[in-house]
Amino acid sequence: MPDDPAPAPAAEAPAQELPKPRPKDEPETVVALREMIEGKLATLGGYLVDNHGNYVLGLQTARTFVVPTWLENGATVVRVFAITNLAVPVTAELTQWLLEKNLEFVFGAFALDVENGAIWFNHNLLGQFAAPEELEATIAAVIETANRFDDEIKTRFGGRLYVEGAEGVVPPPAAPGYL
């Protein structure tokens, strides 16, 4: 046996995980909720984390966000939402259509950010009672609904899809009337 044995093969260096951003003073209950969310999202094919600590799923044409947060009373909430459209002219017809659609949904609802002409589809869960299977079903419902209606909203009311640049803005269709 030689005095200077060959070195053992080097083990692969562990993948370095970048620290994920977290809101300042995030309670331990939200940290625990994040562990459940991250575990479930990892089984769904991956995710990104934005600068605010929100989880982002870039599936299809509507980005979906999963946002764990807390209320002043200590309760935790998981907000799951997709921003479907931007730069949509806000009209009475649009708001009526959104409200009528909301009556059809079992889970979730459309919301309108008037200032940005943004349409969201969202559903919230009570974090302290949320189970991984419930989170998965909620994410699936939000993604499916957002992708089902985003093109229709663009065609009927103008604006653009969330994933399109400003060059994708479609003017609203001409209103029938006098001329």
List where the protein language model places each region.
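Ordered, soluble secondary-structure elements with a strong preference for glycine-centered loop motifs
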Residues: 27, 31, 88-92, 129-136
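Short, highly charged C-terminal tails/helix-capping segments
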Residues: 153-179
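A short acidic-to-branched-hydrophobic micro-motif
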Residues: 65-87
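Short, ordered beta-strand-loop transition motifs
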Residues: 47-53, 70-74, 112-116
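A short, solvent-exposed beta-edge/loop patch
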Residues: 114-145
